[in-house]
Design a protein with these regions (language model features):
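Histidine-/acidic-rich catalytic cores in large beta-rich domains
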Residues: 1-253
Length: 253
């Protein structure tokens, strides 16, 4: 367990090939070892928020900094800046801009702009390749095997799938569509090796104290729940997750 400091919030977490932990904490992003040693700490200036820290295909890191303008910065494995894109998202309040930014298989960036209810595909040189208007404030994104985009829509209590070529909405799963659970704030959604989806069901904006739902929900291809984590006492709110397969903890002795 690695504790966040007071005032920090983590909306992105990943495990590197070396077994180090990458996470964002709003005022920056850190890469730490399993025994809490800081490899690097990238701090962001005042009036900005570093909400996204995700892995690139080459093992580097993509940072997403909310601000005017927004910044998307690539770091190499040693934490050195190797590419930077600045973009005016036309959203003055940094906290309303985005949460998770991922690199697509074609090396472009996918940027869900919450306040504008749209998703941008942007090249590494800062050119807008595609723009999708959606019905929902997307927290994150998942590039599916067929190239289409799955978008978790936060406080809209749903996730959608859109056609990558046309932007058409192909599927929408609403709050009560999954038998046995209810979707609250839909955070990151991951696809596991078996094709199942793992949904982060964040409850931070839930106003009704009687609402009690799992923090993590795994569903199969038919939309049936096959596993869930329901332990608010020991775990708390979950907006982001990292799927670890065949990983062994390093010897810390």
């Amino acid at each position: 367990q690695h504790a966040l400091e007071k005032g920090e919030e983590c909306n992105a977490v990943a495990l590197t090939r070396k077994g180090e932990i990458l996470y964002s904490y709003k005022r920056g992003a850190k890469l730490v070892t399993w025994d809490h040693q800081v490899v690097w700490d990238y701090k962001t200036p005042d009036k900005t928020e570093l909400q996204s820290a995700t892995l690139l295909q080459n093992g580097g890191v993509l940072l997403g900094i909310c601000g005017v303008p927004a910044q998307f910065i690539e770091l190499d494995k040693k934490g050195k800046e190797v590419n930077k894109v600045t973009l005016n998202l036309e959203v003055e309040r940094p906290h309303s801009q985005f949460r998770q930014i991922f690199q697509l298989r074609n090396s472009n960036y996918l940027i869900p702009v919450m306040a504008k209810q749209k998703v941008l595909e942007v090249s590494r040189k800062g050119k807008i390749i595609a723009e999708y208007q959606i019905e929902g404030k997307a927290f994150s994104s998942l590039e599916l095997p067929d190239g289409n985009l799955l978008l978790p829509c936060g406080d809209n209590h749903c996730y959608i799938v859109i056609d990558r070529k046309t932007g058409e909405e192909l599927k929408r799963v609403n709050a009560l569509d999954i038998e046995g659970v209810a979707l609250l704030f839909v955070g990151q959604i991951l696809q596991l090796k078996n094709g199942n989806l793992l949904i982060c069901n964040w409850y931070g904006h839930t106003k009704d104290a009687t609402v009690d739902e799992p923090q993590l929900i795994e569903i199969d291809k038919n939309g049936k729940v096959v596993w869930s984590l329901h332990d608010k006492k020991n775990v708390g709110k979950i907006s982001a997750a990292c799927y670890i397969d065949n990983f062994r903890l390093p010897n810390l002795k």
